């Protein structure tokens, strides 16, 4: 696959979405927001931060063979596998990332 490093990772944390309950579903429709996906993003961020705090590396994968994962782990059809968070000890140091400056991505009191 696209992420050959994942084959050697000792831990895969799958994030599986369940259908929201009635109240959450209606709230999401009214507000035009997908609250379960927001919650999943928050949880994934905290998982990776916790891994880093323990000296582990992590990688959040959204592109994987969901059908194969679902079959392998007997995940019901009514649930969606949203993310695979791979956790393990890094074999290489983290490469320096090219990032935009703070001024390019942060604004105060206006967009």
Where are these regions (language model features)?
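Glycine/small-residue-rich phosphate/adenosyl-binding loop
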Residues: 1-40
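Solvent-exposed alpha-helices and their adjacent loops that cap or buttress functional pockets
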Residues: 5-7, 75-77, 97-99
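Aromatic/hydrophobic pocket-lining residues that form π-stacking "cages" and hydrophobic walls in ligand
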Residues: 47
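Hydrophobic pocket-lining residues that define ligand/cofactor binding sites across diverse proteins
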Residues: 51
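Structured binding elements
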Residues: 55
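Short, electropositive alpha-helical surface patch
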Residues: 68-82
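C-terminal helix-cap and adjacent tail motif
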Residues: 83-111
